[in-house]
């Protein structure tokens, strides 16, 4: 749909739902990530899911597209690290399988490095707005989701220690 039509359809759908639990919306079409969508999220107090996924722009660009604002009324922020950008699901799955450890073809790339930096930046943006970042990692993004989350956590801690 067109961006304005998408917002209308979302509004019709969410108007019929109770306010709790707090919804966060994940859109996987870049052309829908426009000002009216983020304005609508803010008006309704709904959250946007910042997704690192095949066909979406980098997380930092999504942050910029959002107007550098967090919109969830409950103060929660969600990011999903699903697949490398420009990599189809089946290809990422085959590369990451059996998911027991980081896979260099996924975890040692410039894009993977940028993903970790973007999540780190989003964590500090959330902190600055008194929000909590929830990171949902997938094995396909790195080879092993627990290791990806550890890497992000260590990057955040390293940054915090550097500020002290």
What kind of feature is each model-predicted range?
Residues 1-164:
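Residues lining hydrophobic/aromatic ligand-binding pockets adjacent to catalytic sites
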């Amino acid at each position: 749909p067109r961006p304005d039509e998408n917002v209308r359809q979302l509004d019709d759908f969410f108007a019929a739902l109770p306010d709790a639990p707090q919804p966060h919306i994940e859109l996987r079409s870049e052309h829908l990530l426009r000002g009216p969508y983020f304005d609508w999220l803010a008006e309704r107090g709904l959250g946007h899911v910042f997704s690192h996924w095949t066909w979406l722009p980098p997380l930092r660009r999504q942050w910029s597209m959002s107007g550098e604002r967090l919109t969830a009324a409950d103060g929660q922020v969600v990011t999903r690290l699903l697949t490398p950008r420009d990599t189809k699901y089946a290809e990422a799955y085959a590369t990451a399988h059996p998911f027991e450890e980081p896979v260099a073809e996924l975890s040692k790339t410039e894009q993977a490095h940028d993903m970790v930096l973007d999540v780190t930046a989003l964590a500090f943006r959330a902190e600055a707005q008194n929000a909590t970042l929830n990171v949902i990692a997938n094995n396909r993004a790195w080879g092993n989701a627990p290791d990806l989350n550890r890497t992000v956590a260590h990057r955040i801690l390293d940054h915090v220690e550097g500020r002290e």
